[in-house]
């Protein structure tokens, strides 16, 4: 088994399926409405994230592969928001606009980390002419190494059989994350990736490993599949292929925070790895490692090449660098067992300059290990505006991890790192600038745990904003 990452940059993948926009409204609630016995939420933060097939496409793009997305949308603000969000992460969208239907949108209202209600805005696309989708697939088949069909039963894959046959005729593997119990719809696919409950809904309850193997092989034969991958949560995943022994991979998840979107990550990594020229067994190996990373994050997430490389090389256990939250907790625990003092700071670190380097070096001198928590791209946009960050999250983390002063780099999605700090609980929390210690996010949690909080001065004359202005002035 190879442990070097696939050459994702040479991979081209098309995703066809049910695209949707996930909207999140966050805010505090402190009273009950006088109109009805329901809480009143004062909305303070609004987030929009691509969902469904769009999340699969984002997972492929996050690896550095060429990612194309085809689906059905309305002609509305949600469709425009989807296109803009996906363009920012290098997903090439080729939507079919249907003027009679709205773009599928799911709105969630949350307060104090609890979802209060979900509102679905959708109208099934069943009955919509599938020919424009077929045309887009045909045009791309000579330029892609894999086709993913992402089925959420919203109508985009009503003609899934024709799509499978188009790809088979061109010799392009077809990977499908199935929906429902009618696997006949997917006859002739290269690979189906049901989770255990989806598998058992078709095959029946499995009491033993042998039951899974025997019933899985029957499904392969009955529906003319090339392979079947059963994802089994904490039990890992099992690949079944005709004429080959079952290939089982135990889970690599160190700690599970959220399984949202894990299936999208699995099929995205599978497709990108196959399109890179690797075997199906190798694709499962990398997909399993990626799943172990993504469930260690909160919310729907993607996996970067750096995170995937760390996972397959075991750097989370023995080394340093960019890490998931779950891996970082393990590394910090090991450091404390060695009697090391852990220092933590945070920031955007968009364009790294001398002031940053000096500040991080000074922070590192205050302890034995330095953690740098980095705002994700979405978090940075909310904090700094739509023109930021200049450098994407992965590049910012790679540069930080290369600094001698920095031991661990971890991203966070929220507006502040308060939740992350409360999970890590460093011995010393450091922030640069003119903050008061009590105003620093996470300070109360660190103090309550017996730690310290300190403010360090930034080097005069060094500012990312000033650098950007200077570049703009000279361009």
UniProtKB/Swiss-Prot annotation:
* Broadest EC class assigned to this enzyme: transferase
Q: Identify the stretch(es) annotated as Cytidylyltransferase.
A: 344-475
Keywords in alphabetical order, please: ATP-binding, Carbohydrate metabolism, Kinase, Multifunctional enzyme, Nucleotide-binding, Nucleotidyltransferase, Transferase
Tell me the Gene3D superfamilies matching this sequence: 3.40.1190.20, HUPs
Q: Which GO terms describe its biological process?
A: ADP-L-glycero-beta-D-manno-heptose biosynthetic process
**Binding-site residues for ATP, renumbered to this chain:** 195-198
Name the pathway: Nucleotide-sugar biosynthesis; ADP-L-glycero-beta-D-manno-heptose biosynthesis; ADP-L-glycero-beta-D-manno-heptose from D-glycero-beta-D-manno-heptose 7-phosphate: step 1/4; Nucleotide-sugar biosynthesis; ADP-L-glycero-beta-D-manno-heptose biosynthesis; ADP-L-glycero-beta-D-manno-heptose from D-glycero-beta-D-manno-heptose 7-phosphate: step 3/4
- Which segments carry the region annotation Ribokinase? 1-318
Q: What is this protein identified as?
A: Bifunctional protein HldE
Identify the species of origin: Cronobacter sakazakii (strain ATCC BAA-894) (Enterobacter sakazakii)
Q: Species lineage, top-down? A: Bacteria, Pseudomonadati, Pseudomonadota, Gammaproteobacteria, Enterobacterales
Give the gene that encodes this protein. Answer: hldE
